Amino acid sequence: MTVDAPELLEKLRITDAGANGADMSSSTSAAANGTGKEVDDGSDDDGTENPPAVAAEHSTAKKKKNKKRKPKKKQPKVQTDPPSIPLSQLFPNNSYPKGEEVEYKDENRYRTTSEEKRHLDNLNSDFLSDYRQAAEAHRQVRQWAQRNIKPGQTLLEIANGIEESARCLVGHDGLTEGDSLIAGMGFPTGLNIDNIVAHYSPNAGCKTVLAQNNVLKVDIGIHVGGRIVDSAFTMAFDPMYDNLLAAVKDATNTGVREAGIDVRVGELGGYIQEAMESYECEIRGKTYPIKAIRNLCGHTILPYSIHGTKNVPFVKSNDMTKMEEGDVFAIETFGSTGSGRYVEGGEVSHYALRGDADRKDLTLSSARSLLTAIKKNFSTIPFCRRYLDRIGQEKYLLGLNYLVKSGIVEDYPPLNEKPGTYTAQFEHTILLRPTVKEVISRGDDY
């Protein structure tokens, strides 16, 4: 719509030199240029023909109008402590930080400059954006956890703090049906002390308190759109455990460094074992060789499924399976001052719906309703009892055990080394992109 500002101004001067005319001339002039500012009518008139009262009233109107304008709310630029601002506000263009990019070696070196491979890489923009958002959430949450986890805290306090922040950063609290499938926890936060190797997360009512002489493994999974970032670290508060942690960190970094397209996983396990078992650790005057836990493996990650079909052993093996373009691997290692083997046992906290389960008729009504809730809120993403509590499930244990016995839900008991031993874990998620290997979870901390 076009407005002839000079003509309007002339009419206003003729009909009314009062406040209404001045106010209307201001507003219509602003409308004419679309900016909210007055326009020049092209005359040599300096405005002296307008009575002073009109000019004063016009000025007052402008001031009043300006007072009504509320300044735009600025987006926060700095994360809070603990982290609570969604990453979408810190990275408004969804341009999340890349992980560590590493060029392939030897016969795959050409991939870095191949136009064909670059094109394939560009087709994965949504995939990479989801993974990088989950990875940035992981870095911010875990670095806060590393600064704040202290002896004297309960495992429940630690787990709830980590998970609350993770959900805030991805912008989905998981309290409405299906919300946690958009983004949220990739699996229950593992808080495994001393000889407990993996798969322990505190259930409601857990009273365990972290002690000064404990070795704590913190395993966190965060997903966006089903793209799970799986990364873990170990904390100890007594320097006598330093060599144990150093051995496992070195082994994980070795696995990350040697992994790549066409690498055979059995050979990769040999590199990991060699790095791990070159260390020993003196604890209370006794020296222990660090052993790789040989009946555990790293693994591929699939959408909405933390364990894929390929494994990466921690020891040399004859497994000729090759890593391939497009694979996503969790390269993790566990070291121990004990036998180097785990056994299952203890109170179960981790569960997951089996993707291949036969959906047989369930005679127990509580099992049927629980299964519906699991499907709608978690699908095949692992969950724990605390997560069922959060979505309002009550008196579900009988139904949950029934689903486990029916083979529809898998339970994952804690994995334990011998009592009195100590274990450590470090883990990264890597993407075998067409052009480069991206260590998506890499951070300044590890």
Swiss-Prot record:
Region (Disordered): 14-116
Main location: cytoplasm
Keyword Metal-binding: yes
Pfam name, any one: Peptidase_M24
Residues where a divalent metal cation 2 binds: 230, 299, 332, 427
A molecular function GO annotation: metalloexopeptidase activity
Protein name: Methionine aminopeptidase 2-1
